[in-house]
UniProtKB/Swiss-Prot annotation:
Protein's recorded name: DNA ligase
EC number in record: 6.5.1.2
Role, per record: DNA ligase that catalyzes the formation of phosphodiester linkages between 5'-phosphoryl and 3'-hydroxyl groups in double-stranded DNA using NAD as a coenzyme and as the energy source for the reaction. It is essential for DNA replication and repair of damaged DNA.
GO biological process: DNA repair; DNA replication
Species whose genome carries this gene: Afipia carboxidovorans (strain ATCC 49405 / DSM 1227 / KCTC 32145 / OM5)
Gene (name only): ligA
Amino acid sequence: MAAKSKKPLPSVDQLTKAQAKVEHKRLALEIAMHDERYYQKDAPTVSDAAYDSLRQRLNAVEARFPELVTTDSPSQKVGAQPSRAFAKIRHAVPMLSLGNAFSDEEVAEFVARVRRFLNLGADEPLAVVAEPKIDGLSLSLRYENGELVNAATRGDGFEGEDVTANVRTIKDVPHKLKGKNIPAVCEVRGEVYMLREDFLTLNKKQADSGDTIFANPRNSAAGSLRQKNVAITASRPLKFFAYAWGEMSAMPATTQFEMVKWFEKAGFAVNPRMILCRDVEALLRYYREIETERAQLSYDIDGVVYKVDRLDWQTRLGFVSRSPRWAIAHKFAAEQATTVLEKIDIQVGRTGALTPVARLAAVTVGGVVVQNATLHNEDEIARKDIREGDTVVIQRAGDVIPQVVSVVTDKRPKHAKPYSFPHVCPVCGSHAVREEGEAVRRCTGALICPAQAVERLKHFVSRLAFDIEGLGDKQIHEFYDAKLIMHPVDIFTLAKRDAHATDKLKDREGYGDVSVRNLFAAIDARRRIELNRLIFALGIRHVGEGNAKLLARHYGTIENFRAAMAEAAAAQTEEGNPSEAYADLNAIGGVGDIVADAVVEFFAEERNVKALNELLHEIEVLPAEQVRADSAVAGKTVVFTGSLTKFTREEAKAQAERLGAKVSGSVSKKTDYVVAGEEAGSKLTKARELGVAVLTEDEWLKLIEG
């Protein structure tokens, strides 16, 4: 079940159409994941350079296979969906991102493209504004009659988050515009950022108070702006540079340079390093100057932006997909340094992923002391042939996560041996397996691995699992730290152990007689649990709510399920000759190889089985309810939408599934029924557009009750 090492990615020119389709899907999913982490969670996990390389490969695939381009492709999108934590604001003019240039040649080609598009003669001048590219959070400010009325983040480019109240606390953002010639509607756009000095001071305060430490100034600025508590934003030293605009009822200027100067007169801070250039050579000289002075600047930048100066030419040039033709970002090369890799450590994440980390002889990269760097995964170690004791090149790009770029092989010590990636978890000793098609090796000790314990316990008591009232994330952390709940079974022995303990739970801060009695009662109320909930609670990789129900319905009882998995796990080592139990598992509709392998891997780890057996001594597992094949909705696809009054959404879903229906979260041509409650929205609209049958709650009940 473990996969072989992956080969380096083939050149795009070598891809067949079928391979390109698979590669395009992989790149789109990976880019979407990184967009969400960057734009929504303010917690990027790859460097700017690594992200840019994904974008470049996607663009190359789409250039060779243009039929793969869809409206959902990352090349057609900007940013990520706005967070649900904030109200949304629709941008009157989309907030698009910029195309990137990574070399002098690409900058020269940008200028040549502009000249060709505008049909400029060889001697006709082309003025271009150049300015540092601030590494912060894009923001749009809307003024009506000179007064600030709202502020929104970029979001997905078309719809952003309403952060008006928070933005009003930023000193660089005027509440009322100054001067004359102010348009009735004026949208000013720019970047929220934080000075490096302020970032370091903030992180020290965060550390002293035990709060979250930010990775870099960009993350701290984004996280500070996107606070639900306005007082927190007000306490953070946020700044704002204005450099662009959205909807304008009248234009105060005719050039980019004059517009930015008008922003300054209106009361905004603007970047004093903005200049006007007349040719490619001047652009590149400016780029070198800013690159040289980068470390001395008080704020982070990740490149230089070039914009055609004349606004009428900007209008003629227009846009292509997700970016304007009249502007481009000239990105800096990643900052690098050379040092010795002293040791490779393996860290185990909360999902069981084994991640290699390089421990380095301390080296300064871009003004920051680096002692650790990511090695990504075992394939990267093998591909670069990274060994302990090697002299390596370290790169920091975008101030995110340092990484090992390459090995200086002529400095390799004679005793250095190829690194052997562990096949067991360094924390708990369980098997570490790598699934087909994945780069990550994972610990299979789901129930017993300390590195995964807290997240597994939180999952175990979650709403779709044991759903124990009063035992949430906070309590799980507290009880784990106090060594009161280390494994699932400890939840159900907590009351018994507390009765004989010297330090009673009721004497702990935040607890008392009543709260402890209520907690123990809530735990006892969950000693009887449905089979599908138990299977879901085990936290087996790839086994979500839906697959847990499929497994429960197929095996019926916990005894049948355990016996079948024991047989399948026992025969696991017989390559090419799966047991009858494994074949039966794999044949369940909706399960397949990936889920089947994950379930068998779980039961192949003896300590998981031992932990489950201990748990079963404390609980009663109810047999699965059998699906009715003769009901009126058996085999039908149903969508519930709006506010239901006769039952909860979960009750409606469970009832429909017991009757053999498939419950979906979205409406499509394959949907048979949409059950619409009060205030039904877009799903109801789409159902009517597609001609899908729409039922009220009463009509639904009449249908299923015959």
